[in-house]
Amino acid sequence: MKKWLGSLLIALLVLAGCNEQEATPSEESSPETEQGTESGFPLTVTDAVGNEVTIEKAPDAIVSMIPSNTEILFALGLDEEVVGVSDYDNYPEAAATKEKIGGFEFNVETITALQPDLILAHESAWSTAEAGLQPLKDAGVPIFVVDNAMSFDETYETIEAIGEVTGKAEEAETLVADMQKQVEEIEAKLAEVEDKKTVFIESSGDPEIYTAGQGTLMQEFLDRINAENAVADQEGWLMMNSEEIVSRNPDVIVLTYNYIENAVDAVKARPGFDQVTAVQQDAVVQVNEDIVTRPGPRLPLALEELAKAVYPDLMND
């Protein structure tokens, strides 16, 4: 039985250092899309890694290799069409009942047995997943690599792209419009913030503390809630030691991970952190990792979680 290195942990690591690739909204006139029948199928599209993918009909057996893709599929009403998901898929609840294809390693034999007519892979882990999926590609199974969304707009475009290849383009447009409306409502609550809080986003704990600078989705979250990034002078995802965090003295520290027990207390107990404003003001906050790190339909909820973490008084008004 062959097992191939899968997508999830690597997706997070690659996300830390990869360059952004802008997705292009699909249109009938786009050179990247060729539509046939009125239903939109057969359909030929170009995916995030430049591969031309032909889909003969609206898929009814979809394998999703990463949780964000799965959340999008369910939000588009494709509950029954999803036949396989990763070991880490836990939302919505129905996703947890689907056949598991593996976690850090995916099982190509399990995927094959599901007889998928569409596989949704992810750009951030494609370099390691490609070889394992090659037998399925050779057998004629369409494999669409989804863009590694690094912004709100790219997330919307990803949803629209998945909607297109699954025959749910209208549903995708409706979903995106609803998300945009929710985002606008949250932004409106914080539009008049005068005393902006400085925030340190901590995506992993000791001994390797990672944070997010410019050009990341986390930076856009902070921009949209009228907060300052404590590492706005840095680019992308980077590792930072405790001493540097203390010197930057953030007003709020947001923990976007759940794998360390009593993480908030652990941060407060670090040497020198008793001098940090966030610790003195009891503003070290842990948020739901799944919600804030998956670029998908829960993006507005992620924005709300971060807004409540940074400006609890304003968000509770």
Please tell me what each predicted stretch does.
Residues 61-114, 118-125:
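A short, structured surface patch at a secondary-structure boundary
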Residues 126-131, 147-161, 196-217, 260-263:
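Extracytoplasmic ligand-binding site segments that recognize negatively charged/polar headgroups
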Residues 86-91, 210-237:
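Alpha-helical, coiled-coil/dimerization segments enriched in small aliphatic residues
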Residues 47-50, 99-109, 234-242:
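Short helix-initiation/N-cap motifs at beta->coil->alpha
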Residues 108-121, 141, 242-255:
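Proline-aspartate-enriched helix->loop->beta-strand connector
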Residues 2-8, 16-68, 169-199, 249, ...:
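Bacterial Sec-exported substrate-binding components of ABC uptake systems
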Residues 154, 160-164, 173, 177, ...:
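Structured C-terminal subdomain patch of bacterial secreted/periplasmic proteins
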Residues 66, 123-124, 234-237, 256-260, ...:
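Short secondary-structure boundary segments
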